[in-house]
Amino acid sequence: MTSTRKAPFSHNTMSRALFLLLLLCLPGLETSAATPLRQQLVFDYGWKFHLCQDTTEVVSALQQLGITDMPHFGTDASAPKGGATIGETEPEIQTAQTEAAVGVGAPTGSANGGKETNASAAFADVQLPHDWSIALPIDPKQGGSAGYLPGGQGIYTKDFTLPSSIKSNDQVAVYFGAAYHRATVWLNGHKLGYHMYGYTGFEMDMTPYLNRKGQNRLVVHLNTEEKSRWYTGAGIYRHAYLHVTGRQHIKTWGVYAKVTCEDGQWTIAPVVELTNGEGCKVSHQVLDAQGKVHIKAFSGSAVMDNPRLWTLDDPYLYILRTCVRDARGQLVDQTDTRFGVRSFSFDADRGFSLNGQPMKLKGMCLHQDVGTLGVAVPDRVMERRLQALKDFGCNAIRSSHNPASEEFLNICDTLGLLVLDEAFDKWKSGFYAPFFDDNAVQDITDMVVSHRNHPSIIIWSIGNEVQEAWNEDEVGVERARMFNDLVHRLDPTRPTLVACQQGFQDKFGEVTDLVGYNYLEPRMVADHKRHPNRKLLVTEAFVYYSGLRENIVRDWVERNPWYFVEDNDFVAGSFLWAGVDYHGESSPWPAKGWCSCPFDMTLEERPQAAYYHPAWKPEEPYLKLVVRDNCFDQAVGTDHWQYPIMADTWDLPFSDGRTVQIRCYTTCDSVQFYFPMWSNPQLPLKPRVTADYPDHTITLQLPARHGKVLAVGYKDGQPILRDSLVNRGKVAGLKMECDRPSLVTLPQELSAAGGSQQNVAHVRLTLVDKDGYRQQMDPRLITAEVEGQGTLLGIETGDFRRDGFTGQSIKSYFGSALLRIQSTHETGSIRVKVTVEGLPEPYYLDIPVKGRP
């Protein structure tokens, strides 16, 4: 399908953003669950993995697995193009698919007859998602960009037999949400194809080579020897599925619901792509969120009367049910696609609006890794992260610097978070440079076609800080124009941008729909005057400091950068760098990652993050006391990307004549402070930044004296809030808090995908004194053990200076640690046992595990 570009992003334009295509055929009006027309089956379990030392070992292991058609090991121009792509492909870019990718030749039996080989005997059992790099020893030779963690080459194998629900004439494909990176896939010794990019999903047809009555062996080789400038992880780190359909079926990513609004009338006009669709007819229904019919069967288009709009507070999702009948009128395929109805616009003078309501994008940039999990992140862990960011006041996420996962976008759709979905970092100057020319167009196509049904997405970023901006020639501009035009053909409803650094906005400002500024906010004022029709937003902002000059990043002042956005209507919003600590781009050794974000790896809010509560939620009562002092043992960040060192404790070194700075972040009108033998008058705090109290922050210098600092906040003359800093006693106990009263089991292998993802519990461990208050300044070794129907995914703190990311023990950090525990496939109970250095008895917590609903 080739779309003509319309005038995008006006108030009358409705985003055709919809939820991800759900491939499992749900019970409905057209078919029964007993005989599904299509299946999406869980394929995460029963995998084996082997990390190879070098290419020679890779070749040997693959040969022992019965494979003779080797992967391409080089990075030269002869490297293969990514294959087996799915979704809509423009005619001029079909060269990105190879013959090997679609499986040409006659099927044969299982390689080695399913017998154990020397290579397979050395493989370890793993389940997907899986990141092999995070479990490797820290190696300073690997460099700080990768978090000092190695990559290398790895091989996955999986032996499986088809379930009886798959009929003899069904088409069967394997789908990977992502695999990092340079994936080569074989089935029963036959190469199915390649997929080079490590951040997009891909599907490979297994039908020609399947052994339908016996065992099959799937083999995946990944090569992560090229380093990126942050931690990428390594492995099949997103979910895998079997896709089962009839010969005539809807393509994966093949439903695109086009929703428009003209003169107040909403219309849905779905576009459907079929495989072997000769003689087929397509019809649709629209269901509400409860499954009741909203629009009866139609083909072509239909009017949606008074739809319930998708908003940040009410992210309502409809269901588009698509049915395909063959020439005889027999139903051959059916699928449900969730979508949201909403409009948005960017304006050069007024910024951003959603459903006609002006608002600022209060955004955060996110890398996809999570602490000890690396990039293999269970859905529940990501849900907890995104919910915490929304509760903090964030309303938009930038997927830095790669396409987000389908599961991530599903969560944003249901929580009501907006998304800037990003294709690449650096273009040809980055780690992907050897493969960029042959694969980039297909990679962008995959991102847009697979994600355009998500109402959360409002912007496509075609690149970040691209090195081509430095070139004097027009290569970078022409590449941006090509990518921009491609995106608009695939989705004419969302704007594009390049996130630019060092004042290169002019180079791409006439190409993309929006102009992204990484820092350099002062330049935006001048650019708005020079180019009044451009639509501007801050794609990266410091978390604490503000820039001073137009073209110099390393010139800053201590001021909350949000107030620049708030004070300038033409700025659509900003995205903090970054929202949550991440591996790689490491702060000075011994830190193994970036540790200057509002949230640490455990998702505990830093005291410094209080800086943003009055800025992002000025209408909510808030008061927070912190101490700014270099006595606290914290990993420091990089230059002005870091926070000043702060903590919310009064357990600090005391000495005569020593003073410390107290900071009070508040939305109160005034605050009364109390200190032993001392008090001062009420201090008026105005609702906006003033010369007296900038950034809603009152600062005091107080003696470092044993006792208590108390602050009482007043609104309209009445006390409404209080906070205190108090000396705490010695560690006397442990508090264990679990975020889930119970868990559900993991889904069974080859079962229907979907259902509850509440299979991970987070247990917060807090050291407390005899009165139950947190003691932050007495670190203790904590050891955790898990028994029963659960496994310990990891134990960690907010300290990135640890020596590795495996094991069951860790030193507490400011009195805290976190456990992540996952259920198994069996019902029962999980018993968590925790011992603390210096405490005589262990502590226990029981978590019930229930069956899947």
Q: Which residues fall in each region the model found?
A:
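Beta-strand-rich binding/interaction modules
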Residues: 265-298, 320, 660-684, 708-713, ...
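Extended carbohydrate-recognition surfaces in non-catalytic/accessory domains of CAZymes
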Residues: 34-175, 233-236, 623-638, 645, ...
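Short flexible loop/turn segments that cap and initiate beta-strands
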Residues: 222, 280-283, 313-318, 659, ...
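Extended acidic/polar, glycine-enriched regions
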Residues: 211, 271-347, 703, 715, ...
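Accessory beta-strand-rich segments of carbohydrate-active enzymes
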Residues: 145-252, 277, 417-420, 543, ...
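Short, hydrophobic beta-strand segments
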Residues: 206-208, 300-310, 698-704, 806-825
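Active-site-adjacent substrate/metal-binding segments within catalytic domains
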Residues: 123-124, 129-162, 166-187, 193-196, ...
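Substrate-binding clefts and catalytic carboxylate motifs of secreted carbohydrate-active enzymes
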Residues: 39-59, 71, 179, 227, ...
